[in-house]
Amino acid sequence: IVTIDLLEEAGVPLAELGSQTLAALGEVYPPWMSPSNPADIWPAIEHSGPRKVYETALKAVMEDPAVDSLVMHLFTSMIDGSMFAELARLKEELGKPVVAWLAGVGDTFRTLRSELEDLGIPTFDEMQRCVSVLAAIRRHARDSTHKQPRTGRQG
């Protein structure tokens, strides 16, 4: 919830997930829980296992036309970087920025950080910085696509 507040303050709106995305998420969620955005995947992980949930959820969310960027909050003790190879491919193919806020310590933290950064996914150990960087990436992309060429003449 704090992340959503920070995203809102930074001008990054929360996407409304499409029906196909919600259906794909529903495949890995427990029967008693309906998926939404933000995607609370912990119950899904307990129900379907981390690899299946991350791979299913990340693919579905990245392919949703309403989603233009992704913030992940990852607990490093239960994840390995090989789970994110498809995400890195989708990130490049779809041109959607992805950032990760990592929670953890020690070797597992350092290993996951290195694996994600090798895949071109920036990582942060502080939520505010993660959100600020994503907002800056989005502003840069928006400003780059809306600039008009300069002719040297004034109106």
Outline where the language-model segments fall:
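Charged helix-capping and loop-helix junction motifs
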Residues: E55, M83-A88
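A C-terminal functional module that forms or caps the active site or interfaces directly
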Residues: D80
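Peripheral docking tails and interdomain loops at the edges
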Residues: I1-P13, E86-G155
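Short glycine-cluster motifs
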Residues: I1-V67, M72-F75
